[in-house]
Amino acid sequence: DAHTTEVEPKTSAPIIDVQPAQREILEKHMYGGTMRLGAYAAILKEKTQVLKLYQETGRLKEDEKRINELMKDKSQAFRLGILERGKKTVLERHRHRYEVNPRFVDLLEKNGMVFSGYYERFDKTKLMEYIELPNHPFLISTQSHPEFKSRLGNPSPLFYGFIKACGR
């Protein structure tokens, strides 16, 4: 019965849903400001496929420079959220209203999924950015749009990983 409220608004298991703070705004048909749009930071978990791909492609170092630039601009603090010192962090672009429902994160992890990256809002809500199935050759999903930063000579770490897995 798991579903997204974007497709099935009355699902009893809304795995993907709008955040509670957005619901009231959307019910009034006021869509401005309800979308996560542009670059946002994601803290990556150690010993995950996602972290390994970002390390292999050099994107961690590349994104570290941009994160340091954003830290100097107080008006962009919302893009970084709460960062944890010493944690590996990347920036990816977004364009969506729906998020993994925090109520289901523990259940999904208990059943084998790994949330390998997250963004932490200033209210301490963690928004899941990456999910993977560790023992699968390549089952990785993201909230971001890696195609926005992918180039032929510098592919997205996730696209790089997918092609690499296809070649095995």
What do these predicted regions represent?
Residues 1-168:
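Amide-donor transfer/coupling interface in amidating biosynthetic enzymes
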